[in-house]
Amino acid sequence: MIRVEKTTLAIIGLGYVGLPLAVEFGKKFSTIGYDINQSRVDELESGTDATLECSSEELAQASLLEFTTDLSALKTANCYIVTVPTPVDSSNRPNLTPLIKASETVGQVISKGDVVIYESTVYPGATEEDCIPVVEKVSGLKFNEDFFAGYSPERINPGDKEHRLPTIKKVTSGSTPDVAEFIDNLYLSIITAGTHKAPSIKAAEAAKVIENTQRDVNIALVNELSLIFNRMGIDTLDVLEAAGSKWNFLPFRPGLVGGHCIGVDPYYLTHKAQQTGYHPEMILAGRRLNDNMGKYVVSEVVKLMLHRKLQVSGSKVLVMGLTFKENCPDIRNTKVVDLVSEFKDYGCDVDFLDPWADPQEVHQEYGITMTSNIDELSTGKYNAVILAVAHNEFKAMGVSSIRDLLPEDGVLYDIKYVLPKEACHPKKHNPSIRVRGKCRWQHSTPQGFAEDRDSPSSTTDRFRRHPPP
């Protein structure tokens, strides 16, 4: 068995999860950061991280870390950590292609006595049933005799500068007791928050997938409550704050649920459940409800426009924010894009503004042309403005600057509860429509949208519907 102090690591995948891991290990161990994207490697070698997870100073501190796209360079490692995405396909079925390809990569370079650790979120059993057989086939080695494996689910929270890799407790597991001990000690060398050693790889896999599934289901509950209270003319936030005065009331809030984990991971669990012959009811119902919240937001905005006798078809709508959370460039599976198709169904012309998102990446991923320059916006140009992401730049604009984008009777819909209540009133105060314009969601922590992948359960959006007079 490898001794921790003799470990040479290879991190497979240098995205939001892999890079912070490589940087932390690279401060203490000889570490190879491997990615198939040459431009990503070039960027990191220049001391820049486009994901903004690691600063130039942090990259420089990892003096034992080198980056490469050269597969042969991985042969010097004796411990491989796989940190690739695990998405779903268009039918919401698990897509293990990145994981299988990463396993093939490991299989080409792994040697006797080596250890491979998976961090990607999967359904219980995926590591041993789907990944390890690939490593065995490609390498010609036998699992738990020639090489060993473990699973330690990632808990990276993109954009969160408070909860960083070393300060988040790590779940670890291994294919044998000795391997489990080695993996646990390896992570303890960089995780100041400590570790939790799970009794099996499957238990660790299941623990990870239910973290996000639990959040998704709870958000679905409060999303449904917000729809009910809206019909009853009750302020949802008032209800949640009152209920929250009890010590054991869970502080979930409604919101758009997208991103690359909370809106994806439940499908991994339901897929495996269905393979066992069980059809999960609550989890899938929650997914359906959460996926429809974008449609609900647009329908509410359209109602406000009609109430103000605004022409909906042909109207100009500005959506402020596109990333799946505030102050973060990550656009993966952002549910803000759902607003586009819904508004276009009503014949609206939609513009996007996001100072954090890369316009080229946005166009490539979603076919959307957007601007990142706030100064390009024209006064009074839009019939409706949707504040969808609480970027600091939007907060700095202030109420007057944002309202200047609208005509006198324009609709300002504050999803993120960034602005004070009165900001959502029409410029010409009219009590008959004042209350209809205050339909807002607020986020309760620095996390951003409820779409976030690994935020605490309380870091979701708050929906506020104000009752009619």
List each model region and its residues.
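Structural/interface elements that position substrates and couple domains in central-metabolism enzymes
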Residues: 1-432
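A cross-taxon signal for low-complexity, glycine/charged-rich
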Residues: 442-445, 450-459, 465-469
